[in-house]
Amino acid sequence: HLYYPNFLNRYSKSKGDKEVIRITLEDNIQHPQHGEGYEKRTQYSADMIHQTALEWIDSQNGEQPFFGVFTYTLPHAELVQPEDSILQYYKEKFTEDKDWISPHWSRYNTSLHAHAQFAAMVTRLDTYVGEVLAKLKEKGFDKNTLVIFTSDNGPHMEGGADPDFFGHNAILRGTKRQTHEGGVRVPFIAWGPGMVPAGVVNDHQLAFY
């Protein structure tokens, strides 16, 4: 879950891949993966995955059905991201914040302004989702495409995340890795004009693995 990794994996039949292809992030490997100097890395994996997702939607011609799974990992430890306007906005909003200093045994790097980092990650993900929907509309796919937004588990406490501060689980008990409802209950939002009624909430139970 490092956001400035040494490599990303790709498997694309449309690109002729017959096996997983490892793509080395050449700019990132010029700097340490942990500790001092890590902040000099510039290739942010979440942005790269999102850009590839938009390009993939753009490549669809509408003549054949398509199915895409966009595996965004925001928000998640480690709590780091580009020093852009999204992060700066939240740095100026929190009167109560904290720094999380990485212990020597952790795979996660130190996170300064951890509350602001987490909030900015949520906004960054929201921006990604908005851009995906905008791209579908631009291509004319929004009238016959079903979009599902979901997650894999409840909130976590690693890397400086603070679910109690944000009230993530409200009245639900537990967090990630626990079998209480707070650990296993996740959002599930479906969007599909003409297919899914807007503004409707139901109590249908399902499992997403």
Segments the model singles out, each with a brief description of its role:
Residues L2-Y209:
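Active-site-proximal cap/lid insertion segments
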